Every structure is written in structure tokens, then in C-alpha cells.
């Protein structure tokens, strides 16, 4: 039995009146498979699914809000390193596209990296760092931003002197990174 299934079973063993599932990562998504369909449930995050009640983050608005300040700083465009898109249009990548469109900027192709694959994000940073026209990057989450910064530094680009990079989620470890 895998650990997610075991943890769900343990939680259900106390006979809860309902469950709250945080659908932000693979474990949260996998947990949905093991929860009985008749169990009252609230799903937080993720995308629109079958749950009776859901709390959906303003992912698209967030992507726009992260991109606009970079454009306000005078960057001609903002490149994006993101995750695979969900089944709805409520994505950070679409918010990034919205911001660029609002300013009349043609969106460059985003670099999509697999979830939780930091090495691919480092490679994306190297790839973007080798381009002379990259001055701003919106990373889809903080982990991706840190990995992109590493890739940029590996090819001699300075952050923020040469390239502005923003992440998303405001994870507490972000303050530990320089």
C-alpha cells in the first residue's frame, strides 16, 4: 500500500464528518482517489473538479499581478517558466499572457517544465540566460524561480542586475535565498 493511501486510511479511521483536501501537489491529487465518494469534502486549490465545494485560487489573476510590475519596470517583455497547464483557463501562465497582451506585447513561447523537476528549471535558466534579449522572467512558483536563478548564474547572468526574476507562492524559504 502506498503512503498516500495509508495516510488517507489512517485519517478515515477516526471517522471524520468530512475532509479538506489541499490539491496543490501529487499527494493531494492522489488522496482524492482514496476518499469515498459519499464523504463530505472541500477541495482547496487545484482546478475545477467533481467536488461539491471547492476553494479555487485566483491563479490567472496572480500570474497577471506578477507580470505587470516587471513590465512597469520597463522590461520590453517577460519570459515565463511554468508548469503544465490544468484543465481550466485559471492558470498562472494565462495570467502572464493576459498581462503581456494588455500591454501590446507578443508573448514569447513559455518554457514548460515538469512538476517538481528542478533540474529542468535550471536548464531553462541556462537557456534563457544565453539569450541576450532576456531581462525579466516570471517563474510559475518559488522553487522554479530559485532553480532558474541558479541556471542564469551558471551562464554568467546576474540577478537582479542583468535579469529580474519573480516567483509565485511566497514560500517562507524564499527569504533564505540570495
Locations of regions flagged by a protein language model:
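Bacterial carbohydrate/catabolite-sensing allosteric modules
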Residues: 1, 5-13, 17-18, 29-178
Amino acid at each position: 500500500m502506498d503512503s498516500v493511501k495509508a495516510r488517507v486510511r489512517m485519517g478515515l479511521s477516526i471517522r471524520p464528518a468530512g475532509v479538506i483536501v489541499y490539491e496543490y501537489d501529487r499527494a493531494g491529487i492522489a488522496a482524492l482517489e482514496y476518499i469515498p465518494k459519499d464523504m463530505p469534502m472541500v477541495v482547496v486549490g487545484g482546478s475545477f473538479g467533481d467536488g461539491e465545494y471547492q476553494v479555487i485560487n485566483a491563479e490567472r489573476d496572480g500570474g497577471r499581478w506578477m507580470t505587470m510590475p516587471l513590465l512597469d519596470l520597463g522590461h520590453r517583455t517577460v519570459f515565463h517558466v511554468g508548469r503544465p497547464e490544468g484543465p481550466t483557463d485559471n492558470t498562472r501562465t494565462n495570467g502572464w499572457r493576459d498581462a503581456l497582451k494588455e500591454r501590446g506585447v507578443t508573448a514569447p513561447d513559455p518554457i514548460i517544465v515538469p512538476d517538481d523537476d528542478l533540474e529542468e528549471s535550471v536548464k531553462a535558466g541556462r537557456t534563457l540566460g544565453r539569450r541576450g534579449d532576456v531581462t525579466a522572467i516570471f517563474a510559475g512558483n518559488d522553487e522554479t524561480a530559485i532553480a532558474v536563478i541558479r541556471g542564469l548564474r551558471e551562464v554568467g547572468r546576474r540577478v537582479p542586475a542583468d535579469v529580474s526574476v519573480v516567483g509565485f507562492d511566497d514560500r517562507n524559504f524564499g527569504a533564505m535565498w540570495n
